[in-house]
Regions:
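Outer-membrane beta-barrel initiation region
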Residues: 1-10, 14, 24, 268-269, ...
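A flexible loop/linker signature enriched in serine peptidases of the S9 family
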Residues: 3-6, 23-34, 49-56, 65, ...
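Short coil/turn segments that connect the beta-strands within blades of beta-propeller domains
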Residues: 16-18, 65-67, 108-110, 154-156, ...
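Short loop/turn segments that connect beta-strands within beta-propeller blades
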Residues: 37-41, 85-89, 128-132, 182-186, ...
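Conserved blade-ending motifs and adjacent loop-strand segments that build the rim/top face
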Residues: 194-205, 236-254, 288-289
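Transmembrane beta-strand segments that form the barrel wall of outer-membrane beta-barrel proteins
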Residues: 319-341, 345-370, 391-399, 403-405, ...
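Solvent-exposed loop/turn segments connecting transmembrane beta-strands
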Residues: 336-345, 352-356, 364-378, 410, ...
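C-terminal outer-membrane beta-barrel translocator/porin domains of Gram-negative envelope proteins
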Residues: 395-396, 406, 419, 446-614, ...
Length: 676
């Protein structure tokens, strides 16, 4: 190939021998199934692999008769099995959440074989055509782990590596390559015809040759990964390479040639070698081995196994665990908070249970500012989290980040709320949550969420219910999502003075990766419509500004707040009202800039993330008299800071220019340090 391929799956030779099929995860690009031309090394992307795994990317199998590639998605959770038709380019789902990997195609009966992991047990399964279900052939004991399944070209033999406990108690596990008859394995008989080990080294990626006479694989037997050949008829094992850096995952061709993966700095590189047995192998020396030989006493520095430590004397009590009854004080600290334009001082207490299921936070502060009414100088807030439920209450709620404006979250009066979060789909990278919240406010002077809008009523009831969906992916080394989509749909209602004003809001964002590493283009869209009279503040949404404070928290929306539906950089906060709205934003995420040594060990910058965006907004679409158009264009750059190697922070700088009739547009500058 003309470039390094990054991580690479198992590879297959096309029926005519002109191409090699594999799944790759390039540096800076999302994972794809690709076709590699053997003539010129040209790489053609065929299909994105969602939920790719680390070094193996996906489990891949090939049916040359029907030109079909079988592959797995969501490899880090409950694997799906999908099929890609190479003729049409279309992919279809075969088995969802099947948890089957190490798949291999059996040309004898068109079945797929694989290894399924469930509840800690590995089982050999067979997936007969048309691949709508599986049959369990054998379940390994819990202390056995099988991997690297393969079938001979005629389908009569199966090979796999099996890691099992050592021969003596406490001895290290041993990995053995086993060759079995498939007809016996189909009946649950796992007696091997042949078996071999490679000492303490782990054999990896052993596959059958095209004539079925040999198995080729790799192992760190000498400390460097080399290719080895096992001959079934003589049961002899021989090295066929002597690499300086390492060869991996051989693909046997006709005769004695192999396509192997050579290790390089940016990933694996396909390399052609001749498989000639050799005894000229160079071993490398390990510092740990030399240290143990020089100082034999270190060989006894072995941590005891958990089973040898008696835990019964440490049990204080037994029975059902009730998180709320286990709450205890975790922290009690002094705090400074902002309330509108005043400063309050007080304390904050945090309680939690040892397992982290429940938490309770209580904040209290006092603002000695005589410019405030006396009843607004005391600030109290409490919030409680229990599994999917949250509840809270506040009196003149204050916020630390209000000290650093321009966005203010403090509210006069009292309020209480109850929230609920139910995960409907949790299959990363795909998630779907149902969210609901009801709240009541009393003694208001401004509308919650809109600091520059006077509330038409002192007392206000709000209710929200909706869904949030996420399906985004990123390449290795990414600093942000690079492809995929997100969406949300939320129903909202205000209740005040006997009136109920409902509204409906939806968003949809879709991103596409660019050939430039770690670069993508996103189209972000949103719309909202509300009932009620246009003159009623409760019937309107209000947009404007970046929304970041000079010092801020990720809990308030993250650094990239310009992406929010109600953000509109280049305009003042809440400057653009609308009873209905339609908003589009086009965003280009540029490749990050990485710094090798910018800063000191205690505080340094690891990367910078530049972004460009342009947006357009239409409000009150169904009213000619009040319809308004606004546009903006801007840029933001985020610097990832690390403090004491452990605490990440984000320093963001942005600028935007707004355009709208009536002189509402401004040039807005933003500087924000996200500390948590």
């Amino acid at each position: 190939t003309q470039k390094d391929l990054g991580a690479v799956s198992r590879r297959y030779l096309s029926a005519d021998g002109s191409r090699v099929f594999a799944a790759v995860k390039y540096p800076g690009q999302v994972a794809h199934i690709v076709s590699i031309a053997r003539g010129d090394g040209r790489v053609t992307e065929l299909k994105e692999v969602k939920g790719a795994s680390g070094y193996t990317v996906t489990s891949l199998a090939y049916d040359p008769a029907t030109a079909t590639l079988f592959y797995t998605t969501n490899n880090n959770t409950h694997r799906n099995l999908e099929a890609l038709d190479l003729r049409s380019g279309r992919s279809r789902m075969l088995l969802r959440a099947a948890r089957i990997g190490d798949i291999v195609y059996n040309p004898a009966d068109r079945s797929l074989w694989g290894l399924r992991l469930n509840n800690g047990f590995v089982m050999v399964v067979r997936i007969p055509f048309p691949y709508d279900g599986w049959q369990t052939l054998y379940v390994f004991p819990g202390d056995h782990k099988a991997f690297d399944l393969d079938l001979s070209p005629d389908g009569t033999l199966a090979s796999m590596s099996v890691t099992a406990p050592g021969p003596k108690p406490g001895s290290p596990p041993v990995t053995q390559v086993r060759i079995l008859r498939t007809d016996a394995l189909a009946k649950g008989d796992t007696t091997p015809l042949h078996a071999f080990t490679m000492g303490a080294a782990v054999p990896e990626g052993f596959v059958f040759s095209q004539d079925g006479r040999y198995l080729y694989g790799s192992s760190y037997y000498t400390g460097v990964s080399n290719i080895y050949r096992y001959e079934l008829s003589t049961e002899t094992l021989a090295a066929v390479s002597n690499a300086a850096i390492g060869f991996f995952r051989p693909l046997p061709l006709d005769g004695s040639q192999l396509i192997v993966l050579r290790y390089a700095a940016k990933g694996f590189v396909p390399t052609l070698i001749e498989a000639q047995p050799t005894e000229d192998l160079s071993a490398i020396s390990f510092l740990g081995e030399q240290l143990a030989a020089k100082y034999p006493e270190v060989q006894g520095w072995v941590a005891a196994t958990p089973s040898t430590i008696p835990y019964q004397p440490r049990v204080r009590r037994s029975g059902a665990y009730r998180p709320a009854g286990e709450l205890s004080l975790e922290s009690l600290i002094p705090v400074v908070e902002g309330y509108k334009n005043s400063v309050g001082v007080g304390g904050s207490a945090r309680l939690g249970d040892p397992m982290g299921y429940d938490s309770l936070g209580v904040d209290a502060s006092y603002s000695p500012d005589h410019a405030l009414p006396a009843k607004q100088r005391l600030h109290l807030a409490a919030n409680f989290h229990h599994t999917r439920w949250t509840a809270g209450a506040a009196w003149n709620g204050a916020d630390f980040y209000d000290l650093f404006g321009p966005t203010k979250r403090s509210l006069a009066g009292y309020n209480g709320y109850v929230g609920y979060n139910l995960p409907l789909i949790f299959d990363p990278p795909q998630t779907l949550d149902f969210l609901a919240k009801v709240a009541y406010y009393g003694g208001l002077d401004t509308l919650p969420g809109y600091q520059n809008v006077t509330s038409p009523s002192k007392n206000l009831f709000t209710a929200d219910a909706g869904f949030v969906g996420l399906d985004t992916r990123a390449s290795p080394g990414a600093v942000d999502a690079e492809t995929g989509h997100t969406w949300s749909l939320n129903a909202h209602a205000y209740g005040a003075a006997g009136d109920l004003i409902p509204s409906l809001t939806g968003t949809f964002d879709v991103g596409l990766p660019l050939p430039l590493n770690h670069s993508s283009v996103w189209l972000r869209s949103g719309a909202s419509v509300s009932a009620g009279a246009h003159a009623n503040p409760l019937a309107n949404s209000y947009l404007g500004g970046f929304g970041n404070n000079y010092v801020d928290s990720g809990g308030n929306g993250g650094a990239q707040r310009y992406r929010d539906l109600l953000s509109m950089p280049g305009f003042n906060l809440d400057a653009l009202p609308g009873k209905s709205l339609l908003k589009l934003m086009l965003e280009w995420c540029l490749p990050p800039l990485r710094f090798e040594a910018l800063g000191s060990p205690g505080l340094y910058v690891s990367w910078a993330r530049p972004e460009l965006f342009v947006g357009a907004l239409e409000t009150d679409l169904n009213s000619r008299a009040s319809r308004r158009s606004a546009q903006d264009i801007g840029a933001q750059i985020d610097f990832q800071l690390l403090v004491m190697h452990r605490q990440p922070m984000m320093l963001s700088a942005g600028v935007a220019r707004g355009f709208a009739a009536g002189g509402l547009g401004t040039t807005e500058f933003m500087l924000s340090l996200q500390v948590l």
